[in-house]
Amino acid sequence: MYAAPVALLGLPETPALEEITFELQFGNSTIPFTKNIIYKFNDPVKGEVYRPLEVLPEVTASIPEKVLIFASDEAESVSVIVRAGKDNISGNVSLEHPEGWKVTPAQQAFQLERNGETKTLNFKVTPPKGQSEGFLKPIVSSEGKTFDKELVTIDYDHISYQ
C-alpha cells in the first residue's frame, strides 16, 4: 500500500527535490534567493514546456493490471512491463508473491538499449488451492542492485506535471 510522508499531506503538488540558491551581492548587502532546477524543452503543440528535474531509478517495473482475480486454481498469465531509466541496461525480473503461490519462470532476463524503452515479460502465476489473497510485486536485479519501484506519471493540462 502507498503511504505518503506526513510532510507532503495537503500540499497541492510535490515539492522539487533539487533547488539551487543564488546570492546577489550589492555593495555590502547579500540577497539570497532559491530556485527549483527545471528542464525546458519545446513541444510542437504546447510550445515551451518546463518540467522539474527528475532523479529516477535506473529501471522500473510494473504490473499493468492492478487487481487480478483468479476464478480457479489454474495458472494465469501476468504481464510485467520493464522500463529503462538509462541506456544499455540488462538484468533479471522476478515476482515477489505470497506463500503458497507459484510463479514460472522464477525469473526472466531482459536487455534494453535506450532510456525510456519498455519490454513486456509474461509470467505464469498459479494460486494455491482454496481461497487466498496477496500482493504480487516485480523485483528487478541489475548490475548488482535491486529495484522495486514503479514509475507513475501525472500529466494533465489542468494539473502540474508530477
Predicted regions and their residues:
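Beta-strand-rich binding/interaction modules
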Residues: 1, 18-25, 77-83, 87-101, ...
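Short, surface-exposed loop/turn segments at beta-strand-coil junctions that are enriched for proline
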Residues: 1-14, 27, 111-115, 126-132
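Membrane-proximal interfacial segments on either side of biological membranes
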Residues: 7-34, 38-45
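Short beta-strand elements
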Residues: 29-62, 146-162
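Well-ordered beta-strand positions in beta-sheet-rich domains
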Residues: 30-34, 92, 107-109, 120-122, ...
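Surface-exposed, proline-enriched loop/turn segments that connect beta strands in immunoglobulin-like
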Residues: 64-66, 105-108
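Short, solvent-exposed loop/linker segments at the N-terminal edge
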Residues: 67-74
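Helix-enriched interaction subdomains in cytosolic or periplasmic regions
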Residues: 120-162
